[in-house]
Every structure is written in C-alpha cells, then in structure tokens.
Amino acid sequence: MRRKKGPASSSDHEEPPESDSVIPETPETKRPSGSSLSTAISDSDSDSDSEISGSSMMPVRKLRPRKRKAASSADEYSVSDEEEEIVVKTKRRPTHSRTTRSTSQQAQPAHQKASETVTDIAHPSPLKTSGMAAADSVQQRRRQQMCGSSQESDSRKGGRVSAADDSEEEGQRSKDQERMLRKLQRKFPHLNKNELRDVLQEHDWLIDDALETLRMFSDLVVESEDDSSQTSTPAKHTRRVAETRPQAQVTKLSSPPKPKPSRPLDGTRTSQRIAKQPILAKYTYVSSEEECSDSEASVVNGLLDSDSDQSEETLSKLKTEILCFFQSASVDELTLIAGCSLKKAQKITELRPFKTWKDLDDAMRRRNGLSAELLAGCREVLKEREVVKGLMSKCEEISVKLIQDVTQVMDKGPGSMTQPEILSSTFQLKPYQLIGLNWLVLLHQNKLSGILADEMGLGKTIQAISFLAHLYQEGNHGPHLITVPASTLDNWVRELNLWCPSFKVLVYYGSADDRKYMRYEILNQIVEYNIIVSTYNLAIGNSSDRSLFCKLKLEYAVFDEGHLLKNMNSLRYRHLMAINAKYRLLLTGTPLQNNLLELMSLLNFIMPNMFSSSTSQIAKMFSMKSSEEQSSFERDRITHAKLIMKPFILRRVKSEVLKQLPAKEEQVEFCAMSERQQELYSALLHKLKHSSNGEKRELTNVMMQLRKMSNHPLLHRQFYTTEKLKAMSKLMLKEPSHRDADPALIKEDMEVLSDFELHRLCQQYSALHEYQLNTDVLLDSGKLSLLTQLLNSLKEKGDRVVLFSQFTMMLDILEVFLRHHKHRYNRLDGSTPMSDRIGLIDQFNTDQDIFVFLLSTRAGGLGINLTSANVVILHDIDCNPYNDKQAEGRCHRVGQTKTVKVIKLISKDSIEDTMLRIGERKLKLEQEMTATQDGEEDTLPDDMTTLLKASLGL
C-alpha cells in the first residue's frame, strides 16, 4: 500500500562548467572610459548588409563562466575569441614575458595604433583568421544543438543517467530557459523573441551576461542614430577610436600591468562595427518602461515636442496619428503602450478630449501620474500596427495570385480536375475533395505551405493522401513525414495502404530500443520508404528522435489535428518547428479554438519565413482581450485575421459541401442532482467560498472539485470517513502482502483516495469486503438517473450510442452502470494499447449488438470513425467546446446515413452552467471568421477566471 518515493529528478543537477571557459566580461561600470564602444557592437564575418538580419543583428559575444584565478596568472590577460590560440600557446611561457609584451603595447602612441587598425582591417593576420574560424565552428555546433542533436553529448556521458533522467533534465532545462526568455521579453519588449533566444544561446544561457550585452546594444543604437545624421568617412571613425584609446590604456610602467579587457582594443573590430551602426539602428524602436534610456527618450520626445504650439492642421503625420490614437483608443488598446497600466489608461480616457497636440502634451506633463514617455511608447504601438498592415498586404498579394491560378484551372473545365492515377481505382474522390486536392497543388506550385481546415468528417485524411499521391505521380517521391495523435496512427496506416498501395510506408513507433534500430536503418538507407508515419509524442520523444527528423531532408511534414500546435510558446511547438521539412501541411477541423492568436500560431508554424519576424507584433495585436468598449481598430481585428489567413487556409463546413449528409440535432439536458449529491455540492461550495486566504486553493483546482461533484459524489471522499479508514487500515494487516505494514501509513495512503477508488480497494482485498459500497450508492447521481431512462428509450428505437466523458474514473462508474442495466459496450481511453484500438472500433462498427461505445473525450475524440452510431451523449462537457465538437464529429461525418443526435448532460445550478455559457461564446469566434458578410464583432469575454469567480460568488 505504501507508495515508494522515486529517486530525485536528475533535473536538479546541473552540468559542471567547462574547463576551458572564458573569464566573465568586465562590468561596464568598472571599465576604463572609451572601451564600451568596442564591446557593445556585435561581431560579423561579413560586411554585406544582406547578412545582417534576424538573429545576426544581435551581439553574438560568447561569455562562458570561468573560475577566478590569482591576479598574477597569465591566463587573465587574453580572453577574446580571436586570441584563444595565443592564450593556449603562451600559457607555457614565463609570466614576465607576457607582462613585458603587454606593457610595450600600452606604451605605443595613438597614431601608431590607428595605422595598425587600418592594416589589420585590410590584411587580417592568419592567427586572427584561425581564431575567428574557431569561433564560427563553435557557433555552428551550437546551432546544431537547436535541432536536438545531442548524440555526442550522450556518448560523453557514457550511460551515467538513464533516458528517463535525460528527458526530465531536458524538460527542467527547457522550463528554465523559457523563464529567462520571458524575463528578457519583459525588459526588451521591442526586440524579437527569436533574437532574444539567439542572444541567450550565444551566452550559454547566462542571463546576466545576456542582459549586460543587450543593455550595451540598446545604448549603442541610440549613439548610432546620432552618428548617422552626420556624414563621416571611415577615416574619421578610425581616428575617433584611436583618439579614445590612450584614455583606456594609459598605465604607468612602474605599476603592475592591469588585466586586459575581455575584448581586443586594437581597433580592428571596432572599426568594422562602427560602419554597421546605421543598419542596426533601423531595427530598433522605442525601449520599454523598464529599460528606456534617457538618451532614447530625449530623441523621441525631442521629435514630438517640436512645433507643439502649432495648430492641428500643421501637425506632422506622426503627431496626427498619435493624437488620434490617444483620442479614440479603448482602455485595452492604451494598455498596449509600454509603461501604461490600466489605471493610467483610465486616467487618459478621463482627460479627453484632446483637440490639439498641445492639449495632449499638457495632459502628459501635468503631474497626474502620466508622462511624456507614453507619447514615445505610442510610436511603438503604431509601428506594430504598420507591421501587421504590411503583413496583410503581402497576404493579399498572394491571394490575388492564387485567385488567378484558380481561375485558369476553372477555365479548363471540370474535366481538368481528376484524381491521381496511382490512387486505387476502387475509391473515388468527391467533388469538394478534388477541389481541396487542387488547392493543395496550387499552394505547392507557388511554394507555399497551408492549413486544410475542413470541418470534421469531410475527409481531410483522404485529401492529404491524394495530394502526396499527386506529388509521387509527378516524380516527387518524398520522403514525407506524417505526424498524428496516437489514437489515429492505425487508421492513417490503413488509409495509406487502401488508397495508394504504391506508397512504401514506414511506421516509426515502438519502444526506445525499437526506434533506435529503426533510426539506424533510416540513416544508413537500409530500409526503403516514401512516407514515415509517427505520433506527436514519439517524433519528439527524446533527443535522438528529434535529431533524426532534423537530419532527414523531408519534402512535406503533415500534421494531423494541427490545432495541437496552437501555442507558439510551448516546448512541443519549438521541437516540431525544428523538423527539417521543405513544406508543412496542417490538418485540423478546429483551426479557431480560444482566440485569434492561436490561429496566428498555426500560420507562423507553416510559414515561419513570412510570419516569424512579426511574431511579437501579431501577439500584441491579436491577444488583446475584448471589452464592452470597442474601438474601430479592435472591431477590425477579425477582418485583419481574415485577410492574413485567406491564402493559407481552406475551410469548408458540412452544410456547404454535403447536401446529402443527414442533419445533426443538438439538445441540452439539465439534470437535477440527487438529494445527497445536492447537499454535498452545496457543502463543498460553502467550504470553498469561506475558506481563509491561506487555505484558498487555486481557481483551477476549485473548478475541478466542483466539476467532479456535479458529475458523481463518489469522485470525492465522503462516504469513507476517517474512522472507517482507521478500521480498514487495521484489517489490512490480515492480508499476506501487508502483515508487516504500519497501519498509520496505510491510513495515510487511503486518505488521498476517492470513495470509488476505496470501493475498488475493498473489492480487491478480502479483508475489506464488508466495506464495499452497495449498488444504490454507486448509482446515486442525477445524470445516471436521467441516463437510465434515456438509454432505455434509445435502445427501443434501435439507436446506437457513443458515450463520452472527460474523466476515466467516471468511465469506470459508467461501466458499473452499464453492467447493472445489462447493456453491451466497448471502451477506449488513453490507457488502451495502440494495438487494440483499431480492433475495438472495427468490432463496434460490425457488431450491431454492441449498444454503447464508452470513450474518453481527449483520446477518443480525434480521427475515429464511428458512423455506425447515430447518438452522441456527452456525459460531461469540456472547458474547450471544440474538443466536444471533435467528439461529435466521430458520428456526423461522411458515411453516416441517419440523423445524428447530440445530447449534452448538464447538472442544473452547477459549475457546468457557466462552462456551457463560456463554450457558446467561444464558438461565436468561429462563426465570425467563417461568415460571408461582415458584421459587428460580438463581445467575446474570454476571461474565464472572472466568469468562474462570478458564478462561484468568490
């Protein structure tokens, strides 16, 4: 009975620092004046403007921890990447030789150093070239680590830790890295997330070093903006550096030599970097409230303060836009400005109207909690809007091109759209599926990826297989990767073999040893294949799995149930993004689930080259919560989203393309809780509402406890009191397996179990048989009472039922209920072995005597065909209504011949009432996105916390 505690997670231990690490960089405040310029700008091997973009724009200085040594150690004097080779060679020399050389270098006149600078730029020494090459090789190795290539590190570890420990350690490390990344995002909101990640990686995820570099980078860009306004020759740049050098290096010969700065001060890299300052400047906007320097604020406010006394007609375009924004923006939009809290936003709305620029400027400087920095922050918001508008323009151009291509196809007549010849002649694509196939072909011809978002049951699997068959017929034999949920793996393999026998399909599935052998065969080209089929969990299961799909050169990566990629900040999203595929195709019946930002995450996944540079702007524009006060820009969000998604998403609903598909009827049954259940629910609600702050649990836990009680009382521990558990723990000593156990520990373990789990424990051990629950207690639930009448009525009509529940323990209780009423059933949940799932589905579809199919909503709601049933009962609804929609689609799909009835069981006057209302509001978002006519956007309060608190009275 007593559960043993497992070993401590390996994630609690960190890898020891590398022995050849570099001395930490000298803090800027302790450096001699004039040296910050040389340490602040990023290094680049090329002067080409085209190469300075994205992450290469950021400083790439690698700072690794080093143990501090005595001041006399020769190792402290040379730490730059270029001089690594010098450090290695001079470690064996006497200390005085290095001191003499260092002193002589410091004594050189400034003009001599300037001439050496020009010489080094034109003719870099072989030693420095090799150092730079070594630095490049280090950077290249680190880039490879992003693809999960950790086989070399695994071999060095030599089996000290198990694969499970590696996974736990990597998971903890990923969480720490995400935490550091979020911290940098808060401090530098104007920088791209991918750029911040690159900076952290280049500094070995040392956040202090990354922060210091980013601060210096931010200060330097402001200087570069000032410098770019003056026309200066390269010679002047060099002379300025040379003139500042004596201040940084003047040292008395009699005093001990000081350690060199962590970067070379010979002027070589400094001159190269200065030439690139204007390029860096154009990527920098206004800094956030936390990190905004005085120089940046003065630059922005200086621009805005000029001509502030003039009339509105003569204001610059920028001032006019800012004035309009502060005059018309909602509170939600005002909070998008860096440093503008909700309180400040409300204050701004109270001070309206702002008829002229002077009115706005005076309001910001009136010591009312506002500041002129908000005007500068407004520029950033306006620039973000411009980025989104530019993205929409690109998408609109693509749409026009695709429409022209579609028109040409339509002009050729319907006969031009035929299914590939290599598809099995036994099957025939439906007209709308042929349209989907041709849409995918057009995307491919334009070198675009896409999202096939047809409603559940319209045959997205078949359309994807047909498209891959078309590529095969055109000479593109792959390889392709199809990533699917575990519950649909067998179905995909079956459909591939049925529809296109020409494909050589490899199923990447099995234990760790099985997959290791398969990786060996794949990488050594021992096995032939066109398509690899795997699951989400195994495709990124461990570093070796991820490394395989980074090394393979895939043509297409197809992701079934693509809405699983809705969170661009998740670890799964990042790992799957690293798969080396030329194109990506997402299949999802529910592209819109909670908000527009999730849709943008899907678009960013399929077209990272187009969307990744605008990720932060898109996140701000589309993650804004709606409110009763809606501005014109906020009302246009759905219109903007439609324009952006139009070229990349094809969505058809059943009512449009399947006129012959039977109707779907939906009804909600409000079930009154049983007398005892109502008492327990009220007591639990009272306890949660009146608990002290120290005892009050998180809202999600409160919600879960109320959900369980509204479904069945036995999901809590109410019947088995503490006195009963004490008696039961003593009886357990009679069992041979627990004779030497401690009754107190047995009782402690029993206290965490629910009533139903304790009931099954009593069934398992003969000593506890007398404590089993009777049938009346097991079936004491309002929903089960209604279900008794409902199933009897459906059985008499000859209907067959698919019964869904969120909780596997509720499925256990439903099994007891079905056996009691003598109903035949099958059951499938997340614990069902993969090898058994397809057999259970086939058995239900062929054996008409099986009345009910029990399914868990998450495991059984994806990609399963159960058209032999015509009634769907949702015993308990999901917080996400689209998961319930997926479950409904198991029956209402191609092949259904009867009217499908969907019945939702809702416990009356419970938490489920609120969940139902939230779900209905979320579904309105999809209706707006798929509407053919524009209309006003309804209020979509997606703040579940507020609604739940209101319903609970908390």
Swiss-Prot record:
> Ranges of Basic and acidic residues compositional bias?
170-181
Task: State the family named in the UniProt similarity comment for this chain.
Answer: Belongs to the SNF2/RAD54 helicase family.
- Which GO cellular component does the record give, naming just one? site of double-strand break
Supply one GO molecular-function term. Answer: ATP binding
- Entry superkingdom: Eukaryota
Motif DEGH box at which residues? Answer: 560-563
Ranges of compositional bias, category Basic residues: 61-70, 89-99
Localization (cell):
Nucleus; Chromosome
In this chain, the stretch annotated as Disordered covers 1-195, 223-273
The residue range of the signal peptide is none
| Residues holding ATP | D454, E455, M456, G457, L458, G459, K460, T461
Query: What gene name is given for the protein in this entry?
Result: smarcad1b
User: Low complexity: which segments have biased composition?
Assistant: 33-43
Q: What is this protein called?
A: SWI/SNF-related matrix-associated actin-dependent regulator of chromatin subfamily A containing DEAD/H box 1B
List the CDD domains hit by this protein, alphabetically. Answer: CUE, DEXHc_SMARCAD1, SF2_C_SNF
Entry EC number(s): 3.6.4.12
Domain CUE residue range list? 176-219
Species name: Danio rerio (Zebrafish)
Stated role: DNA helicase that possesses intrinsic ATP-dependent nucleosome-remodeling activity and is both required for DNA repair and heterochromatin organization. Promotes DNA end resection of double-strand breaks (DSBs) following DNA damage: probably acts by weakening histone DNA interactions in nucleosomes flanking DSBs. Required for the restoration of heterochromatin organization after replication.
Q: Which UniProt keywords apply?
A: ATP-binding, Chromatin regulator, Chromosome, DNA damage, DNA repair, DNA-binding, Helicase, Hydrolase, Nucleotide-binding, Nucleus
Domain Helicase ATP-binding, by residue range, is 441-609
Query: Which biological process annotations from GO are given for this protein?
Result: DNA double-strand break processing; positive regulation of transcription by RNA polymerase II
Q: What class of enzyme is it?
A: hydrolase
The Helicase C-terminal domain is annotated at 786-948
Reactions catalysed, as given in the entry: ATP + H2O = ADP + phosphate + H(+)
